[in-house]
Amino acid sequence: MPAIVGPIAINSISGGVVNFGDSFYLSPKSSSKSALGSGAGNTGDFLLLNNAVNATNYIDPDVNDQDMVGNG
């Protein structure tokens, strides 16, 4: 069944998915992985971080997390 979509204004998109109308199959067109230590991803004003010993596990036993094959 077709969808009727009205006027749309998108100023900015970062790391998201926008769908218009009917959607059957969604899959990312790119992927990435990062490992951050304790408190490394914090943002904002006046941060106070009290971290003791930190050990981030970088071991990843699987070969592929999400395949990119067939994504146009």
Swiss-Prot record:
Pfam families: gerPA. Keywords: Germination, Sporulation. GO terms for biological process: sporulation resulting in formation of a cellular spore. Induction: Expression is sigma K-dependent and negatively regulated by GerE. InterPro entries: Spore_germination_GerPA. Belongs to the GerPA/GerPF family. Required for the formation of functionally normal spores. Could be involved in the establishment of normal spore coat structure and/or permeability, which allows the access of germinants to their receptor. This is Probable spore germination protein GerPF. It comes from Bacillus subtilis (strain 168). The gene is gerPF.
